[in-house]
Amino acid sequence: MCSSDLKQIREDDLRASIGNNKDGWNDVGDYEIGQTVPYRYLTYAPNINGYQTYYFAMHDRMDKALTFNPDSVNVKIGDKVLENGVDYKVVTSGIPSDETFQIQITDLKATINKYFYAEYEGTVPENEKFYGQKIVVEYNATLNENAQLDTGRPGFENDVKLEYSNNPDSDGTGQTGETPWDTVVAFTFRIDGVKVNDQTPEIKLQGAKFRLYSNKDCTEEVYVKKATAGDGYTVINRDSIKNGEKPAEAAEMVSDNDGVFNIIGLDSQTYYLKETQAPAGYRLLKDPVKIDVKATYGKDNRDNYVKGDGATDKTLQKLEASAHFKEFYSGAYSEYGNDLITDIETGTANIKVVNKVGSKLPASGSALTLILVGAGTAVMVTVLIKRRKEVKR
């Protein structure tokens, strides 16, 4: 095959700034658990005029945290979409144990002739036919729950190699050659949360309830469930939800005896953590906490990832996170942000969420609400003064 063979993964965020074509296709991506991970392999048909038949197969091996979706396979030669089961087959059994699947085209030459030269049959000599069409193989996997214990480095790799005929004197079923394995990598992250009060020394608070959202209006919930492995709650990405309905196993997060609530399997993006119930005797946080998780990857690895580099700082170079809080307590409005402590090896951002005791005005924390409360107070004072004057009269 040729030196332009290329395995890629498609990043779901900031696509316009990633990849040679600014379309998100590159060698590195990050995803939520349960999310669809798109892959593709690009190559070109070689000059096969001298072959009677030409065998072509793509071998793929996936990390255990990736689940292959056979129905997602799409194969194109030039602008022609090939037919599964006719032009190629997806093979998942009877292959080497370290491989996940193969896509086999028994005779690439015949397939190209079928789509590009059928109407010229008998009029174009074999040695004048052009071969060199672009071949694109696309397919998806799902980041599964095996990722729960391996957030952060080293990531989850996916490898591909090609097997192809390399002896024009054979009938296409004899000697074959192989390309080196080409690898891409996916990452996922987590938030380790703890609920405390505002006293010194602080007390860990049990029983606070939370939901996670992907938008500031808190209408797009990021569903979670109790982790099947690990210590907390695992994300259920919407790609894994059937018919758009809330999953039966979806749960509300609750801080445990140590005030802990952990969220496992997050993307590099912005989330909104909303408290839905405060611990007994404490005031509810009326505004969601905005949490930004940002992973930074090495530019060279974006386009030229080398197997094993996910465990080094060549790939995942920085993990940053911040939290933005809004509060309205005892008539005072405050808004502040904190940079969170992160652990790049475990892909963890650590957040502390504080509850306070006492009464609280029923406000949302917005500046407009404060103005309205102030205006209401002024009206009440005016009414009281007027009544006192009437009594004196």
Regions found by a protein language model. Name each.
Residues 1-393:
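Solvent-exposed loop/turn and edge beta-strand elements of beta-rich ligand-binding domains
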